[in-house]
Amino acid sequence: MEVKTFYNGNTMPQIGLGTFRVENDENCMESVKYAIEQGYRSIDTAKVYGNEEQVGAGIRAGFESTGIAREDLFITSKLYFEDFGRENVAAAYEASLSRLGLKYLDLYLVHWPGTNEAVMVDTWKGMEDLYKNNKVKNIGVSNFEPEHLEALLAQVSIKPVINQVEYHPYLTQHKLKLYLAAQHIVMESWSPLMNAQILNDETIKDIAQELGKSPAQVVLRWNVQHGVVTIPKSVTPNRISENFRIFDFELSDEQMTRIDGLNQDKRIGPDPKTFEG
């Protein structure tokens, strides 16, 4: 398992299981449990996904079936708009912990920047409070553009360790990627397979055939070779297993360049500059 190291010295697995649009049901629990059994050590959820209870149940089931300890897992959740504001962050964090059945998170993210800079900065100060009080291992952001981060970094004392954003071969986020690298902020992809749309791309399919791998494995490997943390979502056991098996091959420079050339600046999610929930 490859890991990324944050500027604070902590590490995060480079691949994890995403749970966006996964219902809060037994299917969710089983997929999290299965992922842990297959070797996943990072699980990503969020308050707004509405599935923290079953993600937590899957984590507990995974502990039971594998014998691994809590410190072997890296668990992420996220703060949503209704809990913005420094005074609301601690209660929102504790509520997520309660739903998950955990004592701490490895990573807590501000889910979106919103359109009010003062509120964004105030909210981040609540995140800093959690970190300074040793409630959470790492704090970060999601869907932040360079201008959001510039505004934030000018007014706070602790820098986010990570920025989880939409990133796939049709949205390569070149400017943002360079900015994050310069700031020593890790980049993470929340939609690496573009809701499966990218899997039908002819270039991706050609490269998959060249390597004897699946299109999904090619795209996830492209993420990893670009130094991006990636969290593909699936509830299908064979796909969960397949998505994890990306460390036994490499894309050539020529193959990487071909995939890089697919960029269309095409989003499947909201525009971070205007989205308000």
Model segments located where?
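N-terminal binding-site loop/beta-alpha segment at the start of enzyme catalytic domains
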Residues: 1-73, 194, 275
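Acidic-and-aromatic substrate-binding clefts and catalytic sites of carbohydrate-active enzymes
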Residues: 22-26, 46-54, 82-87, 115-118, ...
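Short, acidic/polar
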Residues: 23-36, 85-100, 147-150, 171-172
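Residues at the N-termini of beta-strands
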Residues: 42, 104-107, 138, 162
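Short, well-ordered amphipathic alpha-helices
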Residues: 53-64, 93-97, 127, 149
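A short, structured active-site edge motif that brings together acidic residues
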Residues: 69-83, 107-113, 167
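CE4/NodB-like, metal-dependent polysaccharide N-deacetylase domain
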Residues: 89-110, 129-133, 185
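Beta/alpha (TIM)-barrel catalytic core signal, keyed to glycine-rich beta->alpha loops juxtaposed to Asp/Glu
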Residues: 113-277
